[in-house]
Structures are given as C-alpha cells and as structure tokens.
Design a protein with these regions (language model features):
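Short glycine/serine/threonine-biased micro-segments
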Residues: 20, 84, 114
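Transmembrane helix recognition focused on a "late"/terminal membrane span
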Residues: 27-63, 98, 102-194
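Membrane interfacial helix-start motif at the N-side
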Residues: 53-90
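Hydrophobic residues in alpha-helical segments
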Residues: 11, 83-84, 138
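Central hydrophobic cores of alpha-helical transmembrane segments
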Residues: 91-99
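Short hydrophobic/aromatic segments of transmembrane alpha-helices and their interfaces
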Residues: 1, 71-74, 116-117
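Cys/His-rich metal-coordination motifs, chiefly Zn-binding "fingers/knuckles"
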Residues: 1-31
Length: 194
C-alpha cells in the first residue's frame, strides 16, 4: 500500500490527499527550468568562479546592442589571457600576425611610430573583442560537450573543460615572446645568408 510522502501515513486506494496531514498524494512537480536559465547555468559551470563578472559584461553588451566591450585582463595579459581562457586559435592567429608584422618591420626598417601604432591597434582589437570571443567559445564548447558526453557526465565535463588554464596562458605568452625575439633576428639572418 502507498504511503504519504510527507508524514508516512498509509493512504487509501485512490486518495487525492493524505487523511492525516492533508497534503496532496504526490509532491508538486518542480517548477520548469527555462531554457535561458539552463543555458546560463551551463555558462556558469564553464566559466567558473569569474562567471558573475562575465555575466554582467555580457548582459551590458546585450542591453546596449554592442558586440564589443572592454576586458582589462586581456588588455594587460594579451595573448596570455587568450591562452588562460582557452581561446587557442585566436591566440595562435594573434601570435602569427604579430610575428609577421615584426619581421616585416625589420626588413623594411619601419619607423617605431608604425610599430607602436600596430601594437596599439592589435591590442585594442583583442581587448575589445575578448568578452565576445570568450562567450562564443564557451557556447561552442558547451554545445560540443552536450553532443558528445554521456548524459550523466555533461555538467562535470563542462566544468572540467571550462575555467582558466594558467599553464596555457603562460605557455602562449612565452611562445609570443619567443616568436617576437626570433622575428627580430630574421633580417639579420637573411643578410648573413646572402
């Protein structure tokens, strides 16, 4: 025989409520979770402890209808921030662009003002787009995890693949520094090889 979920009293067959405590026979279903709330919950799992910061930035971007916003961490850490947040393709692209530009400067003896202007433009491009790129990366990663992970492991996998990776940040920052060091010597190497 069935018992009340709240007080444990035996229920009569077909009873809608418990005779002892008066609660409905079945507990009320949990309120439905909106797709938007579930999406934000998964973004919070992916981003980690800094989620409130990014949620505010993304909400402001959405409210203002803008695709760009300022990211101080990206401004100061540049390629290191891209690596820390897992934006590896963008980090490699930025390193390659900076490498080519630095090498071209050496070959053509470009004035330092041009070099400085290029550095400012590249830095602003990364800094202003970092929040948008990170959200796109998070959403793409979450979708890929949902498509491939076993149903009971999705949340754990989202949390594992998200967050920050300081080793990747340091590694990409060092790769960037080494690439610029190498690019600085390309003109000298070319002159020696002639």
């Amino acid at each position: 025989m069935a018992t009340c979920w709240k007080c444990g009293t035996e229920l009569e067959a077909g009873a809608q409520t418990c005779n002892a405590c008066g609660v409905p026979v079945a507990p009320p279903p949990p309120p439905p979770v909106s797709p938007q709330a579930e999406h934000e919950r998964k973004l919070a799992l992916f981003v980690g402890e800094k989620y409130p910061v990014y949620a505010r930035k993304w909400a402001r971007m959405r409210e203002k209808g803008r695709a760009i916003s300022w990211n101080w961490a990206a401004a100061f850490l540049f390629v290191g921030w891209l690596g820390y947040r897992g934006l590896y393709p963008i980090a490699y692209f930025v390193i390659a662009i900076d490498f080519v530009e630095f090498a071209i400067e050496g070959f053509f003896d470009t004035p330092s003002a041009v070099s400085g202007l290029f550095a400012v433009v590249l830095g602003l491009a990364v800094t202003l787009n970092a929040n948008r790129w990170y959200r796109q990366h998070a959403e793409t990663s979450i979708a890929a995890i949902e498509a491939s992970a076993a149903p009971g492991t999705v949340d754990a996998e989202i949390a594992r693949q998200g967050g920050g990776n300081w080793k990747a940040g340091v590694g990409l920052f060092l790769l960037w520094a080494v690439s610029l060091f190498v690019a600085a010597f390309i003109p000298e190497l070319a002159a020696v090889m002639r």
